[in-house]
């Protein structure tokens, strides 16, 4: 293998969901585990040199220190079963590498690279290293690929090369949640951990949408009244935004909106019932047997 599989101009897009999954895996890891390890899933666009990391799942492993030797065992059967289950829901996602947490590369990186090289087929696996210690108040993420080094007929070695282009993709639906989290971080509420009802978020998003529509209408009216020079880029952006919205009459839109609201309320009701049932089961489990 060589580094030719990944050019320095290759754009790597990382979905924010993956970072949250890695952080959750680190927080939920067993007490005996020093780090969290898992599989990275995503898509490759070979024509445009774009790699998108869209999903991940944790893989169980065991770490054992015997003298100066550190043993690392990955549950490969569990990893295969998780990938098969993921393929049922997201068949377009393929294995593109693995992730681990820590300040630096672990001694098990070479063994993990060998395993994921077989899983990735004819391309090199990527390794995403996430420093969950938040040094300097920053979540550090580094992306590596393994390069085989050595002389022909001699001993071969593995060198992990840093891929400098790691772009966090915040252009999708996740941007709404990220903006809300950023708002809560900059202006925290007095009651920490308090979750607002879903309809409150819908009302805030609707209010923000109304403000943006007023801004757009003001711009259009100024252009029509020749108070402002038209901008072609803004015009194309408005055209793309309008053409992306399906043309519906008021009655069809009302029915569709009410149906979505009913589905959301039903989901809230079911999740509340499940939460109540789990709390009751937990309390009943502590009752003494008679």
Curated annotation (Swiss-Prot):
The protein's UniProt keywords, in alphabetical order, are:
Cytoplasm, Initiation factor, Protein biosynthesis
What does the UniProt entry say about where the protein is found? Cytoplasm
Q: Which InterPro entries match?
A: eIF3f, EIF3F/CSN6-like_C, JAMM/MPN+_dom, MPN
Q: Which GO terms describe its molecular function?
A: metallopeptidase activity; translation initiation factor activity; translation initiation factor binding
Residues crossing the lipid bilayer are none
Query: What are the record's GO terms for cellular component?
Result: eukaryotic 43S preinitiation complex; eukaryotic 48S preinitiation complex; eukaryotic translation initiation factor 3 complex, eIF3m
Q: Start and end of every MPN domain? A: 12-150
| Protein's GO biological process | formation of cytoplasmic translation initiation complex
Principal localization reads cytoplasm
Keyword Cytoplasm attached = yes
Checking CDD domains in the record gives:
MPN_eIF3f
Q: Per its UniProt record, what SMART domains does this chain match?
A: JAB_MPN (SM00232)
Subunit and partners:
Component of the eukaryotic translation initiation factor 3 (eIF-3) complex. The eIF-3 complex interacts with pix.
Alphabetical list of HAMAP family matching this protein:
eIF3f
Query: What protein family does this chain belong to?
Result: Belongs to the eIF-3 subunit F family.
Tell me, what does this protein do in biology? Component of the eukaryotic translation initiation factor 3 (eIF-3) complex, which is involved in protein synthesis of a specialized repertoire of mRNAs and, together with other initiation factors, stimulates binding of mRNA and methionyl-tRNAi to the 40S ribosome. The eIF-3 complex specifically targets and initiates translation of a subset of mRNAs involved in cell proliferation.
Protein name as annotated: Eukaryotic translation initiation factor 3 subunit F-2
- The record's gene field reads eIF3f2
